[in-house]
Amino acid sequence: MDKSSGELVTLTPNNNNTVQPVALMRLGVFVPTLKSLKNSKKNTLSRTDATEELTRLSLARAEGFDKVEITGPRLDMDNDFKTWVGIIHSFARHNVIGDKVELPFVEFAKLCGIPSSQSSRRLRERISPSLKRIAGTVISFSRTDEKHTREYITHLVQSAYYDTERDIVQLQADPRLFELYQFDRKVLLQLKAINALKRRESAQALYTFIESLPRDPAPISLARLRARLNLKSPVFSQNQTVRRAMEQLREIGYLDYTEIQRGRTKFFCIHYRRPRLKAPNDESKENPLPPSPAEKVSPEMAEKLALLEKLGITLDDLEKLFKSR
């Protein structure tokens, strides 16, 4: 529903865009590859608290689940995210029988953004590991009281089967999670920006996060963007990665921004977003906003903010804490 006009808007995936559930875009489910050999071989298990986003699902509401966690291998942007895009496209474009969808393997590869010119062996080498990682990603819904615990455990994809000789792919999803595939708070994610950011996984990850935000978003803290990337390097290095990724997003024409500081906290003010990487006919619709002037902070408040930052507590964390009370 377009809030400004009241018009019902249908979002349809095609080769240039995909409809992505907002939850998976905002959460750190798909993250950059850990570059260093030291980090790439350990701590590869990712654990994400998805309670705030996924307790809105009818499954969680019906069963009274109050905690949702996503656990599994790190899913990267360069291969795994594109495979997930292919899965979303498959369920949107093809006839779903029961909880399964079947389509030609070559077509599935195209939906994953893999050129059909690649050999069958190279297709398998790219798709097979990604399907295994996605199928190995567990989503658990639970509720615990003083005496008992109830938990429902499922997977991002229940099963995947392919046969290159017969040219088929079969994908099976948990019917109770179909709502996740067709979440009511969807955004249209343009793949043009993703394709323009080949091998720039940090920029790709920040793009999926920023594009999921509402129109005229509030300033985004540097700490929040660090959390979205879920890197393992020192904070100083992570800050450099975030700034480099934001500059890459500006270079391809997706956005413009200003970095500001309030107290000891750094923020990015987003002036506009252009998922098609070109200016609209009416640029006034972008509502570019000047950066908010830095608010004067008392020395006492500055000390408190510095202590919170030292403890790794962000303003987002405080907001969630107050909401939960």
Curated annotation (Swiss-Prot):
Presence of keyword Membrane: no
Keyword DNA repair attributed: no
Pfam families documented for this protein: Rep3_N
InterPro entries: Initiator_Rep_WH1, WH-like_DNA-bd_sf
Gene3D superfamilies: Winged helix-like DNA-binding domain superfamily/Winged helix DNA-binding domain (1.10.10.10)
GO biological process assignments: DNA replication initiation; plasmid maintenance
Region (Disordered): 279-298
GO MF annotations in UniProt: DNA binding; DNA-directed DNA polymerase activity
Domain of life: Bacteria
Record's keyword terms, sorted: DNA replication, DNA-binding, Plasmid, Plasmid copy control
Purpose of the protein: This protein is essential for plasmid replication; it is involved in copy control functions. In vitro, binds to the DNA repeat units, BCDD'D'', EFG and HIJ.
Family: Belongs to the initiator RepB protein family.
Protein name: RepFIB replication protein A
Organism: Escherichia coli (strain K12)
Higher taxonomy: Bacteria, Pseudomonadati, Pseudomonadota, Gammaproteobacteria, Enterobacterales
